[in-house]
Amino acid sequence: MRRILSVLLENESGALSRVIGLFSQRGYNIETITVAPTEDPSLSKMTIQTIGNEKSIEQIEKQLHKLIDVLRVIKVGQNSHIEREIMLLKVQTNNCKKDDVKHITEVFRGQIVDITSTTYVLQITGTAKKLDSFLKIIRNTTEIIEMTRSGIVGIARG
């Protein structure tokens, strides 16, 4: 099952490496990871998406708490937070596909951020589910030349 952990840690050299090393040593895969400084530049917030059952996630959480740089670990619940991800896609366009690509992008409230004679670069923001739905439709419409996704960022509600 998909799980999200929010980790508050010291913004110091090696802190990220130690967290990733813990996952690697235990044989856990990181699906996505995002890290950025918080409003306090001495701290960073890391959002990790992984796959595992409740027992394995609890074990990861306990091990993370033991790391010296880690100040707080929170298991993010399904309805207790807001999450977003950004995706950039470079797609092939020709005269008959441009209108279709533009329409699909608008329906998903995305943007065309770059245009050449043969390609569009699209930007879509939303939940992972929304991005996956967009990908499924756009793949049936045109060729994807290149794609990148940011990974999940999230914040608690309220």
From Swiss-Prot:
Biological or metabolic pathway of the protein: Amino-acid biosynthesis; L-isoleucine biosynthesis; L-isoleucine from 2-oxobutanoate: step 1/4; Amino-acid biosynthesis; L-valine biosynthesis; L-valine from pyruvate: step 1/4
CDD domains documented for this protein: ACT_AHAS
Gene Ontology cellular-component terms listed: cytosol
EC top class, as a word: transferase
Catalytic activities: 2 pyruvate + H(+) = (2S)-2-acetolactate + CO2
Molecular function (Gene Ontology), one example: acetolactate synthase regulator activity
Entries under Pfam families matching the protein: ACT_AHAS_ss (PF22629), ALS_ss_C (PF10369)
Keywords attached to this entry: Amino-acid biosynthesis, Branched-chain amino acid biosynthesis, Transferase
EC numbers, comma separated: 2.2.1.6
NCBIfam families, per the entry: acolac_sm, PRK11895.1
Cited PANTHER family: ACETOLACTATE SYNTHASE SMALL SUBUNIT (PTHR30239), ACETOLACTATE SYNTHASE SMALL SUBUNIT 1, CHLOROPLASTIC (PTHR30239:SF0)
Listed name of the protein: Acetolactate synthase small subunit
Organism: Buchnera aphidicola subsp. Schizaphis graminum (strain Sg)
